[in-house]
Amino acid sequence: MEKAKDSLPTTGDPVPSQGTINPVDETGGSASDEKKAKKGCDFWFTFSSLVLTAFLSALEGSVVSTALPTIARALEASENYVWVVNVYYLSKYETWLTYLLRFSSAAFQPIYGQLADLWGRRWLTIGAVVIFTVGSGICGGATSIDMLIGGRAIQGLGSAGINMLVELILCDLLPLRERGQFFGIIFMFVILGSVIGPFLGGILVDRVSWRWVFYINIPFSGVCVVLLFFFLHIKNAGTGNFIDKVKRIDFFGNFLLAASVGSCLFALTYGDTRYPFSDTRIIVSLVLGLLGHVAFMFFEASPWCKEPVMPMVLFKNRTSAGAYIATFLQTLVSFWVLYFLPLYFQSTQLVSATRSGVMLLPFSVVYALSSLAGGALTTKLGRFRNIHFASFALMTIGMGTLTILNRSTSLAVIVVLEMIVALAIGVPTANLLTAIQAALPDELNALSTGTFAFLRSVGTIWGVSIPAAIFNNRFDQLLPELSDPTAVRALQRGGAYQQATSEFVDSFPSDVRDVIISIYERSLERVWQIGIVFAGVGFLVIFLERDLKLGTQKKTEDIEINDIPQTAADNSASRPNTINDTASQAPILKQRRSTNQERETV
């Protein structure tokens, strides 16, 4: 591993993979790029099962929201009902893992990439779907809140693997240039699942039973398992016996990363809400979290870490490093908007929660469609850098336009602004992973995908925590303008976020109500202003990327799906399976161009 860290280049040039090289034309593509192989039944059955599993995973993240009150009453959950939501995302996103008493396992999101290299994709994917299905069954049959929480934890563990492995398998099956359009389809269904979840949950609770919020996954997940078993055949497991493989897992790195993220999020979540930011617990948590991240990076790059779960070589290439940062910022901004637009609708426009969901539909629909369009555009052009430039530029402008929102903004203006921001956020969603892998060798696909999924997950949570902290801090600064003591007590120290409903605001006299709305308007304005900075940093980060040409050929020596094209890999005796093998080939690889990773001078 030490050789790998030292041997792989630290420049902006991608590291080509080993294989027979097709003639390269003057545009950087191979002469055979124009001919695309047709995809047969094996591929489409596999892809359909991946789409369905990703959709179900996203659906379960939101479907419970409208069913929670009914579930809480049925199981007499009282205040514990919140864990039904939190426990799902804890195991999935590795944030509060260190605080979750019911979990003793290590962090799962990044480690799935390492497990995929050691044991292969096929059985790991089937196992993740089975775990998700078992968790759904436990939740549906729950007779106590503790049983329900345990089932949600199991669901979350399965969902963590599904989200990462779906993307990784597509990387195995498709050349770089074709990945964008298929990622676009996947993300469109993921967004669709997140959007329709609350509506479906309400219908199932009203018409059938809250238990079918969970039972509905079982038949569809069963179909996915059958399809994956018969049609997904990828042989890329590592060598060695079970004990040897277990020894290669980066347990300490995973633990250190989870603890660091959890410590930072504790400070962001409870700072200025439960405790003031000057409180020792908040300061210590934030400092320990930041130091933990630094320690994690040093450990991953050190000789003590033989098999890093997040090797620093992923970030030594300027294109992959820039795309990773852009991934984090794009996800952060998307949830920044997704969570605070509804708050604006209810606290300032004074609409109901149901009406707020309807008003958010333009954002959700355009977000899904633009994700699909962005992936297709990447496949069409064979490049990604200019797409990222345009997207983040529009994202920065879009966040700026949100600062004009107030109580008198018309619905037409709101819809237009939503669509602008959604278009900007959605277009790069399906091609950021492609940009990362265009600059890295295929041997790093699993680890690069695991890191991509982790940064996206962290961006999801920070995209809520950071603007919430900004909002609460600004609201408390403006709160002295409010003279009503009842309103002050309800709104201070984080209460403003919880009380952002039309019912609460309308419960006060008109003069007090006007002041409350004004404070909400100015607090949200600060949220959008800081959001401009994050989007702007994303635009600047794109300058790190090189304008790489995406190839249309895929080496398939490890893939048994018959309709996947056989190209340069047919003449390759063996492909390096470990980073060390890749490093040993580095002097040769630097002199060659891969069929799907061509270098270009920008």
Swiss-Prot record:
Annotated CDD domains: MFS_Azr1_MDR_like
Membrane-traversing stretches: 43-63, 123-143, 156-176, 185-205, 212-232, 251-271, 282-302, 325-345, 357-377, 386-406, 410-430, 451-471, 524-544
Biased composition (Polar residues): 564-585
Sites where a glycan is attached: N317, N580
The species this protein was found in: Pyricularia grisea
Membrane-topology descriptor: Multi-pass membrane protein
This protein's GO CC annotations: plasma membrane
Keyword terms: Cell membrane, Glycoprotein, Membrane, Transmembrane, Transmembrane helix, Transport
Protein name as it appears in the record: MFS-type efflux transporter pyiT
Residue span of region Disordered: 1-33, 564-602
Domain of life: Eukaryota
Family: Belongs to the major facilitator superfamily.
Function: MFS-type efflux transporter; part of the gene cluster that mediates the biosynthesis of the mycotoxin pyrichalasin H, a tyrosine-derived cytochalasan that inhibits the growth of rice seedlings, but also inhibits lymphocyte capping and actin polymerization and alters cell morphology. Pyrichalasin H is indicated as the responsible agent for the genus-specific pathogenicity of M.grisea toward crabgrass. PyiT might be involved in the excretion of pyrichalasin H.
